[in-house]
């Protein structure tokens, strides 16, 4: 019985010591954070504005800008030199790792949703006026005519190249790219 009581006291002392270290560590971290400045970075990427506010010892604007630029150079339809824009212009190019990763994810989601999610919607997006062109409410005939070359099953990734069944098929990763860029 005495060993059991001694063991409990020892465990209580260890728990108290651990809790004390945890509290002191938390207080030190919080007090250090209070002394760190806030930074506010703004810019344009993916055809839209971004605002980032963060607390850090140094301004990370250049690093943030560089990472967002990588996403823009791969996935932005608003950047005429991006990988996706060049694919949409039917250039035979090797895609970068980022594009391949996002394309594979989009393909998976398209399959899981039975095509409700589809990265080949660029012609539809443009027809409705959400992309580069200002549109009006399109006719049923216009929509139906685009269906001939839209659909995730009409495009695939073979190694580092995108293969389209129809050269009029255009990709739009906007539904994934902005979130992906935020996560990067």
Question: Which positions does each model-derived feature cover?
Answer:
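A contiguous, well-ordered beta/alpha segment that forms the leading edge of an enzyme domain
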Residues: 2-174, 184
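Short, conserved phosphate/pyrophosphate- and ester-handling motifs at nucleotide-, phospho-/glycolipid
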Residues: 178
């Amino acid at each position: 019985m005495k060993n059991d009581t001694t063991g409990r006291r020892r465990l209580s002392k260890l728990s108290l010591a651990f809790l004390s270290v945890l509290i002191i560590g938390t207080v030190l971290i919080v007090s250090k954070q209070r002394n760190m400045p806030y930074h506010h970075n703004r810019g344009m990427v993916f055809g839209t504005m971004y605002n980032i506010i963060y607390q850090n010892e140094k301004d990370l604007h250049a690093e943030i800008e560089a990472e967002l630029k990588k996403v823009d150079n791969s996935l932005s339809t608003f950047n005429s030199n991006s990988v996706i824009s060049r694919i949409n212009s039917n250039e035979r190019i090797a895609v970068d790792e980022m594009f391949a990763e996002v394309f594979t994810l989009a393909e998976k989601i398209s399959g899981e949703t039975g095509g409700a999610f589809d990265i080949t919607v660029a012609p539809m997006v443009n027809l409705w006026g959400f992309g580069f062109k200002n549109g009006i409410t399109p006719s049923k005939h216009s929509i139906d005519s685009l269906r001939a070359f839209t659909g995730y099953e009409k495009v695939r990734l073979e190694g580092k190249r995108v293969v389209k069944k129809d050269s009029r098929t255009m990709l739009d990763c906007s539904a994934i790219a902005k979130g992906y860029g935020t996560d990067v």
